[in-house]
A protein has these predicted regions:
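Alpha-helical protein-protein interaction modules
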Residues: 1-148
């Protein structure tokens, strides 16, 4: 999305018109709405498939911003039960957005240990912006040896 959320919402709308059942489209559109700060649209988009972990991820972020922290925690619990440590990177972004830097950094370190493919987005992911000045975050970034 490259922080081009309005364009992303429009593009995902086109994709949904072609294939309304493609599960990733609603979750990605939900993240675009989240990036725009349109939390009601993010919620609506991500509630379409409540059993899909991607939607649970989006809802964990969105519910928290809507002041529904217990519901947000329930979504994380569903993710952990369904896919466990394989979503270490996603848990890190959730905790970063919730303001829990220590837990976010722990999950990023776990992501590094398990070689979570989400780490490829570490340098540009806006969900991790709250962590960028943390020495532990910077150490992870150095260890990943991104090109300058």
């Amino acid at each position: 999305m490259a922080r081009r959320y309005e364009e992303a919402v429009a593009a995902f709308g086109e994709v949904l018109s072609l294939d309304p059942d493609y599960k990733n489209t609603n979750v990605l559109r939900g993240f675009a709405y989240y990036g725009l700060g349109d939390l009601q649209s993010a919620r609506t988009s991500c509630e379409t498939q409540p059993d899909y972990w991607g939607n649970q991820y989006c809802l964990a972020l969105t519910y928290d911003r809507l002041g529904r922290h217990a519901d947000a925690e329930a979504e994380v619990a569903k993710m952990k039960a369904a896919i466990g440590v394989t979503a270490a990177y996603q848990y890190a972004t959730i905790y970063a957005q919730w303001g829990n830097r220590a837990q976010a950094l722990e999950w990023l370190e776990t992501a590094l240990r398990v070689r979570d493919p989400g780490l490829e987005r570490l340098k540009t992911d806006p969900l991790l912006d709250p962590l960028r000045q943390e020495p532990r975050f910077q150490a992870i970034e150095r260890e990943l040896k991104f090109p300058s």
